[in-house]
Amino acid sequence: PDGFDIAMIKEIGKRMDKKVEIQNMEFKSLIGAMESNSINTIIAGMTKTKERQKSVDFSDSYYTSNQAIILKKDSKIKKLSQLEGKKVGVQEGTTGDIIASGEKFGEKNKVIVKTDVKRYKKGVDAVMDLKNGAIDAVVIDEKPAQEFVKNNAKKLKLVVDSAGAEYYCIAITKGNTAYKEEINKQIKAIGKKIKARPEVEKIEYQSADEAWEEYKEQYF
């Protein structure tokens, strides 16, 4: 079945009577692709930030997540603030990158101390370097972090010390207000449908616990 994001945008497209064409891209290239008019919609677990809002508009939130820290089993680190000066792996351009760089990604989000950031195209590459001792930690979305640790349970562990909730939104071409309003209308309607019929979430969209499946190509 489709992952949460793909199922969501397909449902929105169906409700708007629009054909949805899916393009897989590296996360860091998405906003640039929108600015060059190669795409007009981004749904990729993207958090709304002030910096991104300079380039794109955002819909209302459709999913809430947190960041997590992946560590080696013997690490003494227990919270984000203890990453000060540590070598931290992140997926380039993601919220984890923003946090590890000591920057805010929202008004209500805590700022952590600045780390020695090492950026990767794929989350799996950061985890590999962690296992090999090249870095001290990986900061990444909680859902893929859980999967990485589950697959490396003898060597890795997970710490969730949220810098604040992050809200996934759909990015839209700057200034396309009518399109944004229509997408917001459909997000609200789909949300009500899921709440009214919990079984629909599993049948049509997968459960929230499986939503990260859609991001596998980005992380692995």
Positions of predicted regions on the chain:
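A ligand-binding cleft/hinge motif common to bilobed small-molecule-binding domains
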Residues: 29, 46-54, 99-102, 129-164
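Ligand-binding clefts/hinges and TM-proximal coupling segments of bilobed small-molecule sensing domains
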Residues: 95-118, 150, 157-159, 187-220
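Periplasmic-binding protein-like
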Residues: 63-71, 142, 146, 150-187, ...
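Alpha-to-beta junction loops
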Residues: 17-19, 35-44, 86-87, 122, ...
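Flexible hinge/capping segments at coil-to-helix
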Residues: 71-88
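Short beta-strand->loop
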Residues: 1, 86-93
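Extracytoplasmic small-molecule ligand-binding "clamshell" domains
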Residues: 1-46, 119, 183
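Solvent-exposed coil/turn segments that connect beta secondary-structure elements
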Residues: 25-28, 47-48, 63, 72-75, ...
